[in-house]
């Protein structure tokens, strides 16, 4: 049965939460309105759930209007540990979830990176992820309003995003989630978000907020940075940011 819920609030986090709160089935999956899925999308992902897992994630095509490249290459289907999940895109889509994971969890609303705001907590709550190396989803990056297309200061929200993550981090979760959170911070902040930070008072205030949120919370940060395949100058910048 399909039930259409209409909201005047154009926010992905809010729309996802409305869906969560109005579903009654045992499983959930999210599909963005401008993306499309393969005919066997649910069938393939549900096959992972049937193996006893609470999250099953599949491969997807990153469609930019010219090239159709798979998000993951050289991977095999199978169980992915909490720590090993750092290679998976922290997105809602391309997945089927056991609804029980959302019993006490909701996405960050009115913010970019709302997917990231819950991903490590969901993985830790599930205990692991079952990955299927089949293309099940097509992620459309041509939308002019997509986070992948818009390049402005709306990206300066990682303080809120990681604040939401830490607010949902409970003592009963496997400690490996801390390493996943650190890896996700390095990926999201240093490989993407940092380039949007303006070199003015607004930018400095944002960097200060981010530092306050993650201060002494990123387990293994220095070790991960030291082992990154990036120039020495970049490593020093990353270490200086977290140390100061």
What role is predicted for each listed range?
Residues 79-153:
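Conserved nucleotide-sugar donor-binding catalytic segment
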Residues 53, 196-244:
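Membrane-interface aromatic/basic loop that binds lipid-linked glycans or pyrophosphate carriers
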Residues 7-23:
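Glycine-rich, basic loop-to-helix element that forms the pyrophosphate-binding segment
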Residues 28:
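Short aromatic/hydrophobic "clamp" motif used to bind/position activated sugar donors
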Residues 38-106:
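Flexible acidic/His/Gly-enriched loops in nucleotide-sugar-dependent glycosyltransferase catalytic domains
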Residues 1-6:
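Acidic donor-binding segment of Leloir-type glycosyltransferases
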Residues 32-36:
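The conserved acidic donor/metal-binding loop of glycosyltransferases
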Residues 137-142, 149-175, 188, 196-218:
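Catalytic core of nucleotide-sugar-dependent glycosyltransferases
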